[in-house]
């Protein structure tokens, strides 16, 4: 997917990008490739692949109608090189984006990236989701939490749902169908008061299958969740 294909596809979906937004995506690509030689950000560095498998893939929840251009508080867990939240932010500047990542070098990259792209209302924090999930400044504060290929739902639910307001939504982006994952996550979702409200499949322009699972938080998360760092992965609910 060339940048021109990317812009044309967005326009066909009703999103006509301004020159500034196109420049932001171009700068994003250049910085991603440059920094990838210093720290491991991505295995995908070929331009057309980045536009398809990172940029287009990241904004799919918007193109599929699951996110609006409103000043909502969005948290991205394990965003790595900023996916999916920063491409979403470029497309929808009204979003207030927070990223938590466990690797400080990635936070350094994201901080520089946001400055170079001129993004406002973006916040980056170094640490583990399990620790921030018990912090009152973060717990129960977000309208949306996004996670792209972070962990299976049984683990992911404990890392994300505590951050949501009641009625807030987890948007999980997956490369594989989530049916089996959701079956395994039933107990975790029950304990965390999360309800699956959508399990959506779609295709990238090249025909690759992708999946979005949306979970809504129904009640306040019990205080004991998330458990200490590492436990959700070692002993899933």
From Swiss-Prot:
The keyword Metal-binding does not apply. Coiled coil: none annotated. GO terms for molecular function: rRNA (guanine-N7-)-methyltransferase activity. S-adenosyl-L-methionine binds at residues 78, 83, 129-130, 148. Its main location: cytoplasm. One of its GO terms (cellular component) is cytosol. Keywords: Cytoplasm, Methyltransferase, rRNA processing, S-adenosyl-L-methionine, Transferase. Its EC number is 2.1.1.-. Pfam families: GidB. It is found in: Cytoplasm. Belongs to the methyltransferase superfamily. RNA methyltransferase RsmG family. HAMAP family: 16SrRNA_methyltr_G (MF_00074). PANTHER family: S-ADENOSYL-L-METHIONINE-DEPENDENT METHYLTRANSFERASES SUPERFAMILY PROTEIN. Specifically methylates the N7 position of a guanine in 16S rRNA. This is Ribosomal RNA small subunit methyltransferase G. It comes from Streptococcus pyogenes serotype M4 (strain MGAS10750).
